[in-house]
Amino acid sequence: MQSYQQPLRVGVGGPVGSGKTALLECLCKAMRDHYQIAVVTNDIYTKEDQRILTEAGALEPERIVGVETGGCPHTAIREDASMNLAAVEALARKFGNLEVIFVESGGDNLSATFSPELADLTIYVIDVAEGEKIPRKGGPGITKSDFLVINKTDLAPYVGASLEVMERDTQRMRPERPWTFSNLKKGDGLQAVIDFIVERGMLGVRG
């Protein structure tokens, strides 16, 4: 039987449209020259996120696998993660030397969490367009994720959101846990996410 190493599994969750796929594209493009990476995407009835990442050239197509979860998306990352676990194992066996596998959840609500059997680290993405109230609403995605990304800061003036209020509420809701504001269109906040993954995942700094 071919041996393979166990990669770091990083779960990326958040509501529909928050920027999960955009974050993954940025992470893959920034890290692929230094680390062996693959991605598992989750969609309810399609493999749309897999297609988006493939067409964006985030990674080689064979390193991106789409899972059609059906039903409620959080079930596939928490209560019954078997499809995702199988996809992760298949990628790890196929490449043998993978160091990081990102698992993107289907769009879900603030209560979504990853099973510890599926993700070693969790990143949760919300966006400013949902309003400044989102951080203080709490929920496991806000309070328990290992890293929180508040995306689309450029939209704050258009939706009447105060970044100062969001910062205050975020620090109150997760006082000991890291987070960052981001505007992925400009790359703002991306390095903070990469540094977190490298440090907490004990990957070693390269490049």
UniProtKB/Swiss-Prot annotation:
It is found in: Cytoplasm. InterPro entries: CobW/HypB/UreG_nucleotide-bd (IPR003495), P-loop_NTPase (IPR027417), UreG (IPR004400). It comes from the Bacteria. CDD domains: UreG. GO terms for cellular component: cytoplasm. One of its GO terms (molecular function) is nickel cation binding. Gene3D superfamilies: P-loop containing nucleotide triphosphate hydrolases. It holds the Pfam family cobW. Keywords: Chaperone, Cytoplasm, GTP-binding, Nickel insertion, Nucleotide-binding. GTP binds at G14, P15, V16, G17, S18, G19, K20, T21. Signal peptide: none annotated. One of its GO terms (biological process) is urea catabolic process. Homodimer. UreD, UreF and UreG form a complex that acts as a GTP-hydrolysis-dependent molecular chaperone, activating the urease apoprotein by helping to assemble the nickel containing metallocenter of UreC. The UreE protein probably delivers the nickel. Facilitates the functional incorporation of the urease nickel metallocenter. This process requires GTP hydrolysis, probably effectuated by UreG. NCBIfam families: ureG. Belongs to the SIMIBI class G3E GTPase family. UreG subfamily. This is Urease accessory protein UreG. The lineage of its organism: Bacteria, Pseudomonadati, Pseudomonadota, Gammaproteobacteria, Pseudomonadales.
